[in-house]
């Protein structure tokens, strides 16, 4: 029994080393990719069109003040405002949106557990952009906590929710790379093949063959 444990330990250590090497190589892309998507979507589309609350509404007005700080990348100051909106207007759309902003702020500040906590509380509306982007951000937050199984689960869910050329390939490739880092090449290959077969009008389609080739070897 002791010998079996001793044999298992090096395997586990090798897996941890491979995972660390993966994040060392891809961390900037993992952190930046989805967060950038969310910032663009939230800033340009969501606040003006998705929630459709009057600017005179107090909750929306308070949210807008924090959004200005967010747009200036003053995430620590914006975070305080969003947390206040979430606390004061928890039952409103503005309060719900504040949770998403809180999660993104925490991610930008490198506070990944806090980001997870906030993003878990955000309630999507079944759309094909904001809700899956938030789900993808949650997956990335879990990845940065080295909880890769949960990360892959949420990224795959995000890709399915979006089912479009803009977001799905990004999430599928991220999930695939994480699976590769765990030695699960067969599972990763399926995700890459899904990008090739379903999202041939996406930007990622141009480079998907290299992922397929890597996972096939």
Regions found by a protein language model. Give the residues of each.
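TPR-repeat structural position
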Residues: 75-76, 112, 148, 185
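Short solvent-exposed coil/turn linkers within tandem alpha-helical repeat scaffolds
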Residues: 53, 86-95, 124-132, 159-168, ...
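N-terminal positive-inside, membrane-proximal cytosolic segments immediately preceding the first
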Residues: 1-36
């Amino acid at each position: 029994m002791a010998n079996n444990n001793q044999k298992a330990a090096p395997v586990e250590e090798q897996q941890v080393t491979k995972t660390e090497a993966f994040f060392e190589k891809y961390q900037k892309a993992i952190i930046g990719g989805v967060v950038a998507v969310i910032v663009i979507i939230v800033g340009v589309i969501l606040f003006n069109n998705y929630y459709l609350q009057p600017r005179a509404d107090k909750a929306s007005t308070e949210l807008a003040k924090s959004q200005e700080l967010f747009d200036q990348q003053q995430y620590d100051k914006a975070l305080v405002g969003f947390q206040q909106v979430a606390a004061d207007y928890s039952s409103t759309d503005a309060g719900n949106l504040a949770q998403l902003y809180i999660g993104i702020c925490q991610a930008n500040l490198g506070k990944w557990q806090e980001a997870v906590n906030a993003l878990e509380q955000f309630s999507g509306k079944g759309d094909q952009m904001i809700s899956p982007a938030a789900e993808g951000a949650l997956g990335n937050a879990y990845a940065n906590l080295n909880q890769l199984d949960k990360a892959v689960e949420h990224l795959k869910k995000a890709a399915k929710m979006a089912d479009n050329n803009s977001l799905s390939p990004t999430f599928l490739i991220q999930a695939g790379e994480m699976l590769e880092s765990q030695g699960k090449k067969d599972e990763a290959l399926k995700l890459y093949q899904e990008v090739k077969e379903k999202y041939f009008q996406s930007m990622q389609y141009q480079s998907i063959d290299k992922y397929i080739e890597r996972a096939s070897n």
